[in-house]
């Protein structure tokens, strides 16, 4: 016994669409619409927790405070120089990249701990705000502060 095939007709085009073709076209349309809904660009960076495993240029707490990266030129040039400086870092993966925001993950060599490092370009003040924080543990023994200072030196040297 043959099952009836569902055929849908477009009233103007008189084209037959099978059920599977209609589902595929709907899926493609969904993918394109999801791509258009991009993640909003952050306007600030999260605060550091009360643990000594984080540094941030936006922190008012001296234990967590670190200077932002200063730049001259355009925000686009600053992002290019920043990515060039990050190439010198080992075990770094870019997670999110937008025009004025960059989020990377840095892994430790031995235990593979993950640290989140975020950069937010402030074109009004020619600064790159930075936050580097360990995801786990209480203290990072200054690893995040040293990482940001290494990135700062590489950023200054990058052309």
Task: Provide a role label for each language-model segment.
Residues 5-6, 31:
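A composition/secondary-structure signal for short, hydrophobic, low-basic-content segments
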Residues 2-5, 15:
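Acidic, Ala/Val/Gly-enriched low-complexity intrinsically disordered segments
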């Amino acid at each position: 016994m043959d099952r009836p095939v569902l055929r849908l007709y477009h009233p103007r085009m008189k084209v037959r669409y099978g059920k599977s073709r209609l589902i595929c076209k709907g899926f493609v349309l969904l993918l394109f619409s999801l791509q258009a809904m991009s993640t909003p660009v952050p306007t600030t960076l999260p605060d550091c927790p009360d643990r000594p495993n984080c540094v941030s240029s936006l922190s008012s707490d001296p234990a967590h405070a670190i200077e932002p990266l200063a730049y001259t030129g355009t925000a686009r040039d600053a992002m290019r120089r920043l990515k060039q400086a990050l190439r010198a870092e080992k075990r770094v993966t870019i997670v999110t990249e937008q025009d004025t925001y960059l989020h990377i993950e840095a892994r430790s060599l031995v235990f593979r701990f993950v640290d989140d490092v975020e950069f937010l370009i402030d074109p009004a003040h020619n600064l790159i705000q930075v936050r580097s924080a360990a995801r786990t543990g209480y203290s990072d023994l200054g690893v995040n502060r040293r990482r940001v200072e290494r990135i700062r030196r590489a950023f200054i040297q990058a052309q």
